[in-house]
Amino acid sequence: MSDQERGPLLGQLARIYRDYLTAVVLHGQAAAETLGQNPTDVYALNALELAGPLTTGGLAERIGLSQSATTRLVDRLERAGWVRRGPDPGDRRRVVVEAVPLTPEQDEAAFGAARRRMAEVFDGFSADELRVLFRYFEQAAPALREATAETRSGARAATKGRAKGAR
């Protein structure tokens, strides 16, 4: 593919990607509403399901909240029965948080429609195309986490610069 072909295609891809991300966020909100939660709750539970039990600090890093905000989040989720705290099997002095699995009914209500719709989409892809998608997501998730860290770092630096200039 020539650079002349690639440029417009990348522009179209960026636009479609933004639309996809918006759809993901909106579905996360709908899933949260279905479960009687807010989107941050769902993202925290997803992080725990993907990583397994985490300390509050480890969860904070994965969901982008401060440690104190994450502690309040975990307190609220624990009271509601969505997570439980327990000793870290590797270091019993530490406490870890783990997600309480959704019931099959909760899982179906919140995520069943998305699973079915995405299965329909994936049915239209060959095995080779699915491998490309897998490779994309495998590389895109860490790239977005790095971009998030860079963006947050830049935002903190900009905030500090504004604060110094205001004196």
Language-model-detected regions and their locations in the chain:
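Flexible interhelical turns and helix-capping residues at alpha-helix boundaries
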Residues: 24, 52, 63, 107, ...
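Charged, amphipathic alpha-helical coiled-coil/dimerization segments
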Residues: 75-131
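Short leucine-rich amphipathic alpha-helices used at interfaces
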Residues: 12-13, 19-20, 30, 94-95, ...
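Terminal interaction helix/tail motif
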Residues: 7, 111-167
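C-terminal ligand-sensing/allosteric alpha-helical core of TetR-family HTH transcriptional regulators
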Residues: 12-23, 27, 44, 110, ...
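N-terminal leader segment of winged-helix/HTH proteins
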Residues: 1-35, 39, 167
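N-terminal helix-turn-helix DNA-binding core of bacterial DNA-binding proteins
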Residues: 27-66
